[in-house]
Regions:
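Enzymes that bind and transform nitrogen-containing heteroaromatic metabolites
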Residues: 1-182
Length: 182
C-alpha cells in the first residue's frame, strides 16, 4: 500500500515560510543535492493546500509536478490550473481516497502547514522526512502549530550534508491509539 509522506524543509527555529509566507530563503539550497529527485520518483500523487498551490503555480515556471495527479484542498474553484490538478472540497480524507485511486506509489502531503498538520493529527502520515536548514527566520509559518495530539515517532535515520542541512527521517507510530483531542 502507498505510504503517505511528509517531506519538508524547515528553518532551525521551526518555520517553513518567512513572515510574508515566502520560501525564498530556501533558494541557496538546491533540493537535488538532498535526494529530491529520487524522492519525487517514489511519489505518484500529491496533496496540497490552496495557498501552497497558488504559491507554486504563481512562480511562472513549468509546473514542477507534471505527469502526477495533484489534489488541492480548496472550497473554491482553482481557476487556471495545470493539467492533472484538481480541487478537493471535502478535506484530507477525500483527497487521500482520490490519491490512492490514482496511484499505487507514495503520496506526498506537500503543504502548507495546515494540510500537513491535519494529515498528521488524523493519523494519515506514515513517514516524515524533515530537512533542517541552517537558517533562523525569527518569525513565519510554523512547521506545526498548536498540535492537538502527542505523536510517537520512530527514528529511522539521519543524513548530514556539507552545507549544514540535516535530514531527519521518522516513521510515524500507529501504536498511540485514538488521537487525543484537546
Amino acid at each position: 500500500m502507498a505510504r503517505v509522506r511528509f517531506y519538508v524543509a524547515t528553518s532551525l527555529d521551526g518555520f517553513i515560510a518567512d513572515g510574508e509566507g515566502s520560501v525564498d530563503w530556501l533558494a541557496p539550497y538546491d533540493a537535488r543535492l538532498y535526494g529530491y529527485d529520487s524522492f519525487l520518483e517514489e511519489v505518484g500523487a500529491l496533496i496540497m493546500g490552496r495557498r501552497t498551490f497558488e504559491l507554486i503555480n504563481a512562480v511562472g515556471e513549468d509546473w514542477p509536478y507534471r505527469g502526477k495527479p495533484v489534489f488541492v484542498l480548496s472550497s473554491h474553484s482553482l481557476g487556471r490550473a495545470p493539467t492533472g490538478v484538481s480541487a478537493t472540497t471535502r478535506g484530507m480524507w477525500e483527497a487521500l481516497q482520490q490519491a490512492r485511486q490514482a496511484t499505487a506509489k507514495d503520496i506526498w502531503i506537500v503543504g502548507g502547514a495546515v494540510a500537513m498538520q491535519s494529515a498528521l493529527e488524523d493519523g494519515h502520515i506514515d513517514l516524515m522526512d524533515i530537512f533542517l536548514v541552517p537558517v533562523m527566520l525569527g518569525k513565519g509559518v510554523s512547521l506545526l502549530n498548536d498540535l492537538r495530539l502527542r505523536q510517537t515517532l520512530i527514528f529511522d535515520g539521519i543524513e548530514s550534508f556539507p552545507d549544514g542541512v540535516v535530514k531527519l527521517r521518522y516513521i510515524v507510530s500507529k501504536q498511540d491509539g485514538p488521537r487525543a483531542q484537546t
